[in-house]
Amino acid sequence: YMGKKRIYVALCLIALAMLGICFFYLKKTGWGMTGDKAWNELLDLDKNITLEQLEAKGYINVTGCLDEENETISEFIDNAGNRRPAVLRLTSNENDDLCAKILLYDKDYNFIQMWTMYPNRQQAVAPGKCFSTDVVSSDKDGVVTVTLKNIQNPTVPTEEILQDEMLYKWKK
């Protein structure tokens, strides 16, 4: 009788561990992330937050030109291109102006949406800019520039001025 109980307990623990792993993986892939959550996460950023603190929260620093291709960014682009859930957090500090962005792949409309916040000056940029999942990479003098093509947001009928977004640069 004791042996059966022990096996049962062990099986329960294994099941719990697997659930934990699944949850962690889904969180990493952006499952359950919504535009509202992305927006609120940015609005909740402290006015005195630093680049280092954003990096600690999982934001990728894309200031300037990176020394190599970033795997997390490439994975995000690949997932969005293959209609898989994807979320990407970026930060940069160009001209001493700290910026935080959350990009989210929207499966319903098959596009990438972006939310942008400048926490130090507590300024948010018009939320939910839309981009095509066909990401453009151009190589010039050994520097690869990865650009998102801005597309019309199908849920907002207003004609907006489309502006492509440079995601990041890296040296080949």
Q: Which residues fall in each region the model found?
A:
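General helical secondary-structure elements
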Residues: 1-2, 23
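N-terminal Sec-pathway targeting helices
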Residues: 2-16
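Hydrophobic alpha-helical membrane-insertion segments, chiefly the h-region
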Residues: 16-27
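Mature, Sec-exported extracytoplasmic domains of Gram-positive
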Residues: 25-172
